[in-house]
């Protein structure tokens, strides 16, 4: 606690991220949070809440299973990562997630994009959305691009690029705290090294040539970030708000509908609808009047209104209903 306090005083630190947070105890983490919040109201505390083999009693571990007694402390959400991208262990590198093409995960995907805070029939993992760090990759395990090199090895580069874009947008429009690993915006690779902590710079360095080659995804990522900032609907602060305003369901073929019904006077809309289509086939739907596309697979908005909408293959389209 002394070190935490001094670092905030001397270096004006805004928050801390704890590696292997699960080896610590609930009491210590809560004390750190209280100390930090007294100094800065927006102090942020998060870490790896894995259930690690220590002598601590299970109920005292600062693990994700005890999130209910650690309010305002966030955890890397491996459920989100595995459902969206697919499991990351070497023995399951060929398994797919929802966005990488396995629509059997569609129902689990509903839990992931709603912050894992909605109960039965969905999987509730957290008490509040500020406890989940939504990510598709971190410094550990394979990058999402390397993961697709295994699980989507039958697909061409352009198809995998579209899936990469879908994973980035999913991270940024889901309820909870988005986490983008540096390099995912230009399809970063570690040359299939899934445990590169002791690998040389050749593996772990940022390959800036890829930033040129995949500049279109960088631009798309910028638009995704701007979208989240622009629309408060993707940044609901409490479980109560999510329960009140968000509706999710799975349509035919594993297509996911993510609706947020909320009055928005700034944009003169009363609902947002996100449609996820990770399949090879485009979809068409008939809506009630006054819907328009505000974000397509290029990050562009469409001017026209209509009742008939299209969602191309391998894309997420976002629509708004004019109030």
Model-predicted segments: where are they?
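Flexible glycine/proline-enriched surface loops and loop-helix/loop-strand junctions
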Residues: 12, 128, 204-205
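Active-site-proximal structural scaffolding
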Residues: 9, 22-29, 128, 160, ...
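Conserved alpha/beta catalytic core and glycan-binding cleft of carbohydrate-active enzymes
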Residues: 33-38, 42-187, 191, 246, ...
């Amino acid at each position: 606690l002394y070190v935490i306090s001094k670092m905030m005083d001397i270096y004006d630190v805004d928050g801390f991220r704890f590696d292997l947070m699960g080896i610590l105890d609930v009491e210590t983490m809560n004390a750190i949070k209280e100390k930090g919040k007294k100094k800065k109201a927006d102090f942020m505390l998060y870490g790896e809440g894995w259930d690690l083999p220590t002598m601590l009693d299970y109920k005292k571990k600062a693990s994700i299973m005890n999130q209910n007694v650690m309010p305002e402390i966030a955890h890397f959400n491996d459920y989100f990562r595995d459902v969206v991208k697919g499991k990351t262990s070497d023995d399951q590198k060929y398994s797919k997630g929802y966005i990488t093409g396995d629509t059997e995960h569609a129902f689990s995907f509903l839990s992931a994009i709603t912050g894992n805070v909605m109960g039965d029939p969905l999987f509730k993992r957290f008490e509040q959305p500020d406890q989940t760090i939504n990510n598709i990759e971190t410094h550990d395990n394979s990058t999402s691009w390397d993961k697709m090199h295994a699980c989507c090895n039958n697909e061409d580069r352009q198809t995998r690029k579209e899936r990469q874009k879908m994973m980035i947008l999913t991270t940024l429009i889901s309820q909870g705290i988005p986490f983008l690993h540096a390099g995912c915006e230009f399809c970063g690779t570690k040359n299939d090294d899934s445990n590169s902590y002791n690998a040389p710079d050749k593996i772990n360095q940022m390959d800036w040539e890829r930033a040129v080659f995949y500049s279109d995804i960088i631009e798309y990522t910028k638009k995704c970030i701007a979208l989240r900032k622009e629309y408060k609907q993707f940044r609901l602060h409490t479980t109560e708000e999510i329960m009140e305003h968000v509706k999710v369901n799975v349509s035919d073929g594993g297509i996911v509908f993510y609706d947020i019904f909320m009055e928005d006077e700034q944009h003169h809309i009363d609902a947002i609808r996100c449609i996820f289509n990770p399949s090879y086939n485009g979809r068409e739907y008939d809506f009630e009047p006054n819907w328009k596309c505000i974000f397509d697979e290029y990050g562009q908005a469409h001017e026209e209104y209509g009742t008939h909408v299209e969602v191309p293959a391998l894309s997420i389209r976002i629509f708004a209903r004019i109030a």
